[in-house]
Swiss-Prot record:
Organism taxonomic ancestry: Archaea, Methanobacteriati, Thermoplasmatota, Thermoplasmata, Thermoplasmatales
Protein's name in the database: Putative sulfur carrier protein Ta1170/Ta1414
Record CDD domains: SirA_YedF_YeeD (cd00291)
Organism: Thermoplasma acidophilum (strain ATCC 25905 / DSM 1728 / JCM 9062 / NBRC 15155 / AMRC-C165)
Family, per entry: Belongs to the sulfur carrier protein TusA family.
SUPFAM superfamilies documented for this protein: SirA-like
Disulfide bonds: none
């Protein structure tokens, strides 16, 4: 990943819908152009967060399998 996040949400250990709710909260506070990264150990977040990002018209930068957790990265475009 060559994009440095402006905000990092560490939701490891939290279960759905917690990580997604934290991502939405950060999205609402972010300015257009900001990159938000969420760390989660919940497998549901790996599917739910990208679906919400795309449905809301934002840019999905990537979904990464890290050592024991997932990292979902989005960019606020509007």
């Amino acid at each position: 990943m060559d994009v440095k996040p402006d905000r990092v949400i560490d939701a490891r250990g939290s279960y759905c819908p917690g990580p997604l709710m934290e991502l939405i909260k950060a999205y609402k506070q972010a300015k257009v152009g900001e990159v938000i990264s969420v760390y989660s150990t919940d497998a549901g977040t790996k599917k739910d967060a990208p679906a919400w990002i795309q449905k809301s018209g934002q840019e999905l930068v990537g979904v990464f399998d890290r050592n024991g957790y997932y990292e979902i990265v989005m960019k606020k475009v509007k």
